[in-house]
A protein has these predicted regions:
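Juxtamembrane transmembrane-helix boundary motif
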Residues: 1-20, 29-37, 41, 58-142, ...
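Membrane-interface alpha-helices at helix entry/exit sites of multi-pass transporters
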Residues: 40-50, 72, 163-174
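Short hydrophobic/aromatic, small-residue-rich stretches within specific transmembrane helices
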Residues: 48-52, 173-177, 198-203
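Residue-level micro-sites within transmembrane alpha helices that shape
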Residues: 15, 51, 111, 146, ...
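Structural signal for alpha-helical transmembrane segments and their flanking helix-loop junctions
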Residues: 133-187
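Helix-loop boundary and gating motifs at the non-cytosolic
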Residues: 27-28, 151
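Transmembrane alpha-helices of multi-pass small-molecule transport proteins
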Residues: 47-62
C-alpha cells in the first residue's frame, strides 16, 4: 500500500492530463483511485475538489482561447448549481451510501470517456433560463455530496441536447467544475476542513497534468486510446464501490 501511495502524484498527474483534455477537472478519476485504496470520504472529497479547482481553472483558460462562453446560459446554470454544491457538501452521508453514489457517478464518467456521448455537431439551441437553473441545481447537489465538479454529467447532457458544440462544451464544463468545486470546498470549510500537506502535493501534480492535457485538448487531438484505458479502470472502480 505504501508503494502505491508513493506513486499517487504521478497517477493524479496522468488522470488530470486525460480529463483536462476534454475540459474536465478529473475528480471522478481521483476518487476512483482513492476509493480503490480504501481512503475515507473525509480525505477523498476535499482532495478531489481541490485538485478539481486547479485543473479545471487551467482547462478553462486554454479552451477560452478557442471557444466562446454563452454567458446568459452559463449564469443560469451556475445560479442553480453553486448554492446546491455548497449545501450538498455539508450533507452528512454514511460511508456505505457515499461509496454507492460515488460508484454510480464514476460509471457515468467511464461511459463518457469511451466516447459514447460524442454526438455530431448540430445547430445549437440554448434552453430557457429556468431549465438551465434546474439542471444546475440537480447536478450541484450531487456534486457537493460526492466531491465531483459535475462535468461528467453536464458534458454529455450539453452534447445530447444540442445546447453546445464540442469545444464550447469543454469550455462550459471547465468553468462549471471550477465554480462548483470552490463552492463545495467552502461548504466543507464550514464543517472545519483544512487540507494537509499530502493533499497539496497531489494538487500540484494534478495542476501540472492539467497544463499538459488542456493544451492537448484545445490545440491537438485528444489521446483517445488512453481515455479508453482509463474508462476501463473507472468501470472496475465504480462497480467495486457499488458492491462494497
Amino acid at each position: 500500500m505504501d508503494v502505491v501511495l508513493s506513486f499517487l502524484p504521478l497517477i493524479f498527474f496522468l488522470i488530470a492530463l486525460l480529463y483536462s483534455s476534454v475540459g474536465h477537472g478529473g475528480a471522478s478519476g481521483y476518487l476512483a483511485i482513492m476509493g480503490l485504496l480504501h481512503m475515507v470520504p473525509e480525505t477523498m472529497k476535499p482532495a478531489a475538489l481541490l485538485m478539481n479547482v486547479f485543473v479545471s481553472m487551467v482547462a478553462f483558460i486554454r479552451f477560452s482561447s478557442v471557444s466562446e462562453l454563452p454567458k446568459g446560459f452559463f449564469i443560469a446554470l451556475i445560479a442553480g448549481s453553486m448554492p446546491a454544491a455548497f449545501f450538498g457538501a455539508m450533507i452528512p452521508v454514511t460511508d456505505e451510501v457515499y461509496r454507492k453514489i460515488l460508484g454510480v457517478m464514476i460509471l457515468i464518467a467511464a461511459i463518457r470517456l469511451t466516447g459514447f456521448f460524442n454526438v455530431p455537431e448540430r445547430v445549437i439551441q440554448v434552453p430557457a433560463a429556468y431549465i438551465a437553473i434546474l439542471v444546475g441545481l440537480s447536478i450541484g447537489i450531487v456534486s457537493g455530496i460526492t466531491g465531483i465538479g459535475g462535468g461528467i454529467v453536464l458534458s454529455p447532457l450539453l452534447l445530447i441536447m444540442g445546447w453546445a458544440g464540442l469545444k464550447q462544451t469543454a469550455l462550459i464544463s471547465a468553468l462549471f467544475i471550477f465554480l462548483n468545486s470552490i463552492s463545495g470546498l467552502l461548504g466543507m470549510a464550514m464543517t472545519g476542513f483544512l487540507p494537509d500537506m499530502e493533499i497539496l502535493y497531489w494538487t500540484i501534480a494534478a495542476f501540472c497534468g492539467g497544463l499538459v492535457g488542456s493544451w492537448i485538448g484545445s490545440r491537438k487531438l485528444p489521446p483517445a486510446m488512453m481515455k479508453k484505458v482509463l474508462a476501463m479502470v473507472l468501470i472496475f472502480a465504480g462497480i467495486k464501490l457499488i458492491l462494497q
